[in-house]
């Protein structure tokens, strides 16, 4: 059976990490693409990782390029191309320049990889994934945004740290836009099946501490930006996107929070927003509509409003 093909658009920190993880998991052959001025970076990283494969013990072909024709036949395309956040910069500040980049990338994908499952990482995420779907014209089930898996992973890590338990036993969901208005769901998050509110009653933690963890989750990206000072997170975002790609390529049908296009679910129509979905061979095969209480719904609505305004700004900038 022929190997699958994974195309990575953007050979920066996330792109390089994606290339390594995809190879280590033997998901397929990898194409690392960047702009002509950075073609050497794409080729250099591809060669460097290929040379690591005999040591690590995995088989994968690696190609570095600046030519979109090399995306031909890609099963998955993961898009990281764009300008990273700098300290003091909000995700929204990135709209203008990244919208132009996404338009160019989307046209390349539409022409050369029309059957691909597209995962967008570029910020501001919810607006960029919507723009990608518009530019490609792909079925919305085949265009998805990586945000919720990352935000939930951060939430899970903070909770595991607080409870001093394995991250594997912590399940957590983050809904809404990938930004300051995201909604980490305390009610639907558990440790070994025990909901967080019950753990508060059991004396494992306090509501105040949980509130602090929720806020730290919202600020998770900015915390990393502030520490690195030279860019934004790349290990956890790459791991999150690879988990999504693997679920698609292997038809695992994992339930993951992702930015998906809603068609009436949660009272939202025609907008990409973070919700739990099932990812399988058909792409986004199902949107899981969980019941929200009044407080959660209010926070979710606020997040949706923030995404809507961002989409409007993007539409003006992108023309």
Curated annotation (Swiss-Prot):
It holds the Pfam family Ldh_1_N. GO terms for biological process: carboxylic acid metabolic process; tricarboxylic acid cycle. The keyword Repeat does not apply. Signal peptide: none annotated. It catalyses: (S)-malate + NAD(+) = oxaloacetate + NADH + H(+). GO terms for molecular function: L-malate dehydrogenase (NAD+) activity. Disulfide bonds: none annotated. Keywords: NAD, Oxidoreductase, Tricarboxylic acid cycle. NAD(+) binds at residues 10-15, 34, 98, 121-123. It is an enzyme of class 1 (oxidoreductase). GO terms for cellular component: cytoplasm. The active site is at 178 (proton acceptor). Its EC number is 1.1.1.37. Substrate binds at residues 85, 91, 123, 154. NCBIfam families: MalateDH_bact, PRK06223.1. Belongs to the LDH/MDH superfamily. MDH type 3 family. Catalyzes the reversible oxidation of malate to oxaloacetate. This is Malate dehydrogenase. The lineage of its organism: Bacteria, Pseudomonadati, Pseudomonadota, Alphaproteobacteria, Rhodospirillales.
């Amino acid at each position: 059976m022929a190997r699958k093909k994974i195309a990575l658009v953007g050979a920066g920190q996330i792109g390089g990490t994606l290339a390594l993880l995809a190879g280590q998991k033997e998901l397929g052959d990898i194409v690392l693409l960047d702009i002509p001025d950075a073609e050497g970076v794409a080729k250099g990283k591809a060669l460097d990782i290929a040379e690591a494969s005999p040591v690590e013990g995995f088989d994968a072909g690696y190609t570095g390029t600046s030519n979109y024709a090399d995306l031909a036949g890609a099963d998955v395309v993961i898009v990281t191309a764009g300008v990273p956040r700098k300290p003091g910069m909000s995700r929204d500040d990135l709209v203008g320049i990244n919208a132009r980049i996404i338009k160019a990338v989307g046209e390349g994908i539409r022409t050369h990889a029309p059957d691909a499952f597209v995962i967008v990482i570029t910020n501001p995420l919810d607006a960029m994934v919507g723009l990608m779907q518009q530019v490609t014209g792909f079925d919305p089930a085949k265009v998805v945004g990586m945000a919720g898996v990352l935000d939930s992973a951060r939430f899970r890590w903070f909770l595991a740290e607080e409870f001093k338990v394995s991250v594997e036993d912590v399940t957590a969901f983050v809904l809404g836009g990938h930004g300051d208005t995201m909604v980490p769901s305390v009610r639907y998050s558990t440790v070994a099946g025990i909901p967080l509110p019950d753990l508060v009653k059991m004396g494992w933690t306090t509501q105040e501490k949980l509130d602090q963890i929720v806020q730290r989750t919202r600020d998770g990206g900015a915390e990393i930006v502030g520490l690195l000072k030279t860019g934004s997170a790349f290990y956890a975002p790459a791991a999150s996107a690879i988990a999504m790609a693997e679920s698609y390529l292997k038809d695992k049908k994992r339930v993951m929070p992702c930015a998906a296009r809603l068609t009436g679910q949660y009272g939202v129509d025609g907008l990409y927003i973070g919700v739990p979905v099932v990812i399988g061979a058909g792409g986004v095969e199902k949107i899981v509509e969980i019941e929200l209480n009044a407080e959660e719904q209010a926070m979710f609505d606020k997040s949706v409003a923030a995404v809507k305004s961002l989409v409007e700004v993007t539409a003006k900038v992108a023309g």
